[in-house]
């Protein structure tokens, strides 16, 4: 009896052959490369040869798409037509959906179950032919019909119906456009102020300057900067809707640079409320709105750089007020306009620009104090005294401020103190006398000028100002006659 045979085992695979098999396996598992038909499509050629494709008809209602093999261009089925393995693919922008709204899967296609071509987009669109289409696919179909008739193609102008805005609460611009929300809220209460002056030997008036302000009472009280309205004879206010009114000056605080004017308006006006500037924090977003260069309702944004920039730091020796510093752009004409927080509350009055990115606003807490005191004065019937002005905006010059300006402007005068002229308002005594921007007033009537307050004090007392100003590296003698006006 023979012993049982051992089971047959194939000879061991040589190491070299095993290595070749391992290297070949991933290559065979890779998807078909470009030029190869989709491996899952039944009846597709091994390689796609576009030269062997039959040319599609000249006009395709559903547009031209690739066939199931991804090789040849064919006419896609239009919206609402049947689709599937037997019927062919859907047209451009359409998807094949079986009953109950389920997209046709590979399993459904293998079972040869038909579906319907449905547009992947279901929102209306407005076309360049001023027509509203139910969806993008219908617009594309209309565009193809136009091209067949040798007409211009129809393109998409906007989402949504023609003539209507697109409100998508889930869009990023709808969620995060908080600045626009603030502007929309405050703009109706911001006014444009224009200042007029009579020409000599003529009754004709001409506009000579402009500024901004904001309404604080429904009956027409408006807050602005004192320097905006105390230097001209007639003040005109223009509302956002274009209506214009003559304004009367009710009260002025020159030291704080705040003024209160009033217009007579029938009906109630929109107003802005004052916020608490004491609660303001560095880094908060702020919005400045006004009429720079007479461009009404111009909006700039920025952050609060500091909430307490002391007047003495700005060279205002006798100032007891802390200013709000912001990098929001404030230009000529923005003066008097509101600086608001994201709640739409006024936290300051735009008042001063030193240079790009460094601007200052009077805090709203100071405005509240002014309005309260003004109410008391008017309730007691105290008369407002006449005001003198020469028509300049100035700031006190300190050694640190002079160094900063010297670094920015090489031709800045070589001085360490005085009153630095930021702006000379047209058609004023200052302009008539020859003062210019960037001049530094160093003496008046033989008395040295150390700060802007020295100039203000002399203007109140003297009827003639014999000034010495430093312009570049020259000292120039200038005579200015202050003008007295009724507030």
Curated annotation (Swiss-Prot):
The active site is at 227 (charge relay system), 257 (charge relay system), 335 (charge relay system). One of its GO terms (biological process) is proteolysis. One of its GO terms (cellular component) is plasma membrane. It is an enzyme of class 3 (hydrolase). InterPro entries: Growth_fac_rcpt_cys_sf, IGFBP-like, Kazal_dom, Kazal_dom_sf, PDZ, PDZ_6, PDZ_sf, Peptidase_S1_PA. Its EC number is 3.4.21.-. Residues 40-120 form the IGFBP N-terminal domain. PANTHER family: SERINE PROTEASE FAMILY S1C HTRA-RELATED (PTHR22939), SERINE PROTEASE HTRA1 (PTHR22939:SF13). Serine protease with a variety of targets, including extracellular matrix proteins such as fibronectin. HTRA1-generated fibronectin fragments further induce synovial cells to up-regulate MMP1 and MMP3 production. May also degrade proteoglycans, such as aggrecan, decorin and fibromodulin. Through cleavage of proteoglycans, may release soluble FGF-glycosaminoglycan complexes that promote the range and intensity of FGF signals in the extracellular space. Regulates the availability of insulin-like growth factors (IGFs) by cleaving IGF-binding proteins. This is Serine protease HTRA1.
